[in-house]
Amino acid sequence: MTLARFVLALVLGALPEVVSFDSVLNDSLHHRHRHRHSPPPGLQYPYYLPTQQRPPRTRPPPPLPRFPRPPRALPAQRPHALQAGHTPRPHPWGCPAGEPWVSVTDFGAPCLQWAEVPPFLERSPPASWAQLRGQRHNFCRSPDGAGRPWCFYGDARGKVDWGYCDCRHGSVRLRGGKNEFEGTVEVYASGVWGTVCSSHWDDSDASVICHQLQLGGKGIAKQTPFSGLGLIPIYWSNVRCQGDEENILLCEKDIWQGGVCPQKMAAAVTCSFSHGPTFPIIRLVGGSSVHEGRVELYHAGQWGTVCDDQWDDADAEVICRQLSLSGIAKAWHQAYFGEGSGPVMLDEVRCTGNELSIEQCPKSSWGEHNCGHKEDAGVSCTPLTDGVIRLAGGKGSHEGRLEVYYRGQWGTVCDDGWTELNTYVVCRQLGFKFGKQASANHFEESTGPIWLDDVSCSGKETRFLQCSRRQWGRHDCSHREDVSIACYPGGEGHRLSLGFPVRLMDGENKKEGRVEVFINGQWGTICDDGWTDKDAAVICRQLGYKGPARARTMAYFGEGKGPIHVDNVRCTGNERSLADCIKQDIGRHNCRHSEDAGVICDYFGKKASGNSNKESLSSVCGLRLLHRRQKRIIGGKNSLRGGWPWQVSLRLKSSHGDGRLLCGATLLSSCWVLTAAHCFKRYGNSTRNYAVRVGDYHTLVPEEFEEEVGVQQIVIHREYRPDSSDYDIALVRLQGPEEQCARFSSHVLPACLPLWRERPQKTASNCYITGWGDTGRAYSRTLQQAAIPLLPKRFCEERYKGXFTGRMLCAGNLHEHKRVDSCQGDSGGPLMCERPGESWVVYGVTSWGYGCGVKDSPGVYTKVSAFVPWIKSVTKL
């Protein structure tokens, strides 16, 4: 046993359920013997004219592949190799160039992807195929660069085996012609060259053969009598190519089943080009497909290259046209597809893009140049498939309106949320290093569809369509918002001034939130010292938003985590990115996360006018115009801004005008507010001591819908006693003319009253408490909400004995791990429940309880339905 087989036995023999040394050796020999007499998958055993048994192959089976040395490092790739959609060059130790994508063994078994090989490969020593392990392809390879290419495959018993590959499988050649551009088509399969019956053979089939052989852009179908071919198998008949396939194997066809080929003719071709024999023969060499490669011309009996001096996309357009390759034409420079050999045929090619052949373009004389093969020109003719991108309407393919191909039509991309990271991904896919977004309407508007909107790239994507985006065709844009881009090949003057990546967190939508920046590998926040709308405008501009921007301070969108990266930002409002505004050292600050800065982009806040009659007021009660999610009283969550439009706060006036929160309350109409009587126990019922704030969300940040209204009258229920919790209800009349005290808007609306003696446990569902009360750590700056269940009164009667009366509601969670309750700051605030029909009713006023969120101590709420006649008599509602 050779050393290589011994090593293979050690590695594989330990896993008998997967594969063993004996199975590899014996099964391999068995399969090779068996497949010489049975058809490989997908290809029937060929018949002959005249019919005759195929002679067996007599060469001995090859030895097992030795465990090769670790592969040498691949050559460094130029930055262009990052271009998405551009397949990497074939592994240098696979099948030779020209047939680099063979993925079938020499007896016809399809190869497994290298990523699909069983787990024992992961445990092997620094195995020779370390660079192949996990690769998402199944191309035959020879990792040590010395032996024949091979691959793993699944045998008939479901086990993994390996086999050598025949790199010529699927190859074609032309035989018997007057030159290399014509002849009978022969196909190589299962170790034997065979031919194709000429039935239904046409120019589309012939063109695929010419493409595969890189012998010009057009094939002309011919026929050859079988009588002159001798003994040769027939593989296929009725070949049905579309004409743009890369390989004849990709065309539809019928497996030859014997019988008589019509007219006894074999398929043949003459490779030419679309526009007459005066044009030179062109081929593309060294690419990953027939659609790209180094440009080579056939002139004076030999192949040669083209120098890339003045080589551009217009030249590439002509090459692709001459080769009958549709799609997007792009020029490549500096021997991108490898250096050629032989003479440099042409230099200084200057096509306009409209020529039919490179021969018609201005250029140097044949053979005149000052170039070496390091300057060999190349082209790619990218087929038009869904997701292909281009820049249109500019002076060249490096600039213009960004367009995406989808369902046979080019369309544009809306600039909503467009960032420089998006630009970077687009330019990189197009083969450029840098780029920038062009100004709006810089290029002519498109008249086609708008395919994409709200695109967001991280900058790591290799293809534009890997970025997050809306569904195809979903947008809210016009062509005035089409993205336009200018890309550049390099140079410091064109670098993207990306600054730090920026994101918005914990907002109600993607256009608002706490500002976080990515610095030194970690996301962190910005302190709000000096934070203004000008700073917000720069953040929004960097994120691609063009509308008005508003700054938010005091952790308006909640406190962040991690470091505070930046403080004392000083933007003028004209900068392109946040990085241009930072003057202080990163990480230097004197802040806490309670001062985290935020922004609202595309802000169009506008107050609604006040309502003036009772009928309109009653018609809008209990409506939540803004509610989509649910955060924290104790166990609660931040509410949505405007989500509880009847929530108001009773505030204690001060000489400094910054009255502190005293109690919560509920807006019943433009001029009347419902709260708890005990809120006035300490400071009395003098109206001069109080003010009511409506439309509030963050207690320390003034907002557009927020309004503070004076108090005209305080009405405490006549049965309330300060030493008792019964009859704990009060009404507050706001200052202002009749029903024009607080101005209604989407953020300021009244709640509905319940029916008299209505029992909410039977008629209501989906109950919430709201307020700015104790959150378990401190009083909240933002309005909180918490879902809460209504409980049978016996739970409170058992817990509070005679202190609980029939004019009270019992609500809350009894379990310690579900700590939801109202606390001191929420006194007087509403307990709201939803009636069928989506109207919200104030069933309770937060009154009292034992502690906050204490186990087995539910909250007690004044039952509003018991006081409806009193409320209506006072308010005249």
UniProtKB/Swiss-Prot annotation:
Residues 633-876 form the Peptidase S1 domain. GO terms for biological process: exocytosis; proteolysis. It comes from Pongo pygmaeus. Plays a role in neuronal plasticity and the proteolytic action may subserve structural reorganizations associated with learning and memory operations. PROSITE patterns: KRINGLE_1, KRINGLE_2, SRCR_1, SRCR_2, TRYPSIN_DOM, TRYPSIN_HIS, TRYPSIN_SER. Residues 44-55 have a biased composition (Low complexity). This is Neurotrypsin. Residues 31-90 are annotated as: Disordered. GO terms for cellular component: axon; extracellular region; plasma membrane. One of its GO terms (molecular function) is serine-type endopeptidase activity. The active site is at residues 678, 728, 827. Residues 1-20 form the signal peptide.
